[in-house]
């Protein structure tokens, strides 16, 4: 019977507690982007989450389950057994997950989920999660020709209509590369945050401003922009449509915000 471990993780919650007491199932499918999966697991934990990894056979062709066991500090599910792990993770109980994250998500896996096919540990758990109302976030990774395929597009649209958050990949070098870990973690946090700002448009100004006195002199301030960036990110996580305008700062703007 599958049971999560009681890990001792010295870095848990070091970046925040937005995911404290939240259980995330990180589903990993067969893509070269699986090399980012340990980083994704660790970042979720740094925001307070408990992470359980589920790997398809294709994912195991790229990385070993031992790596994800180390990254998550939990047992890894690589096949479904008579213990019915896909039921343990979605029914009320100590192992129940709050969200299912598929990262990376291949065209094959996404199309199977859209069609109700459940022939791998990942697709079986996804089908169970959909039937139980558990939120799903997917981070696609595939060649650009697959991303542009009309059938794949139809399948992605079908997933969106049933409330699966399909993140936009980074189109680069002829590939639809998995989006950044920051975007993935932000999407998970947003999906698990009450959307009490939904339908609200928020305009945030951050950082220093400059007002000319004459062609040489200005009036300014030493604002770092941290407060404005934090307010913009929090409003976005709570469902707002956020526009952020910033003066020159040393900060990197939140990538999920315009």
Where are these regions (language model features)?
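A cross-family phosphate/adenosyl-ligand binding-site feature
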Residues: 1-225, 229-258
């Amino acid at each position: 019977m599958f049971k999560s471990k009681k890990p001792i993780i010295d870095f848990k919650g070091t970046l925040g507690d937005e995911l404290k007491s939240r259980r995330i199932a990180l589903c990993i499918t067969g893509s070269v982007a699986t090399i980012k999966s340990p980083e994704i697991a660790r970042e979720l934990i740094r925001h307070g989450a408990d992470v359980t990894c589920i790997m398809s056979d294709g994912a195991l062709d790229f990385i070993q389950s031992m790596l994800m066991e180390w990254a998550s500090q939990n047992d890894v599910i690589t096949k479904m057994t008579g213990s019915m792990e896909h039921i343990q993770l979605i029914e009320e109980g100590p192992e129940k997950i709050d969200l299912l994250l598929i990262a990376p998500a291949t065209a094959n896996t996404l199309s199977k989920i859209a069609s109700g096919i459940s022939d791998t540990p990942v697709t079986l758990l996804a089908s169970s999660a959909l039937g139980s109302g558990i939120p799903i976030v997917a981070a696609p990774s595939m060649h650009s020709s697959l991303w542009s395929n009309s059938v794949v597009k139809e399948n992605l649209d079908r997933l969106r209509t049933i409330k699966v958050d399909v993140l936009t990949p980074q189109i680069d070098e002829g590939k639809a590369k998995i989006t950044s870990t920051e975007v993935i973690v932000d999407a998970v946090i947003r999906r698990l945050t009450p959307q009490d700002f939904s339908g609200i448009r928020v305009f945030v100004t951050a950082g220093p401003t400059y007002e000319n006195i004459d062609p040489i002199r200005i009036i300014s301030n030493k604002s770092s922009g941290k407060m404005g960036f934090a307010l913009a990110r929090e409003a976005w996580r709570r469902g707002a449509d956020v526009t952020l305008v910033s003066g020159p700062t040393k900060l990197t703007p939140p990538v999920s915000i315009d």
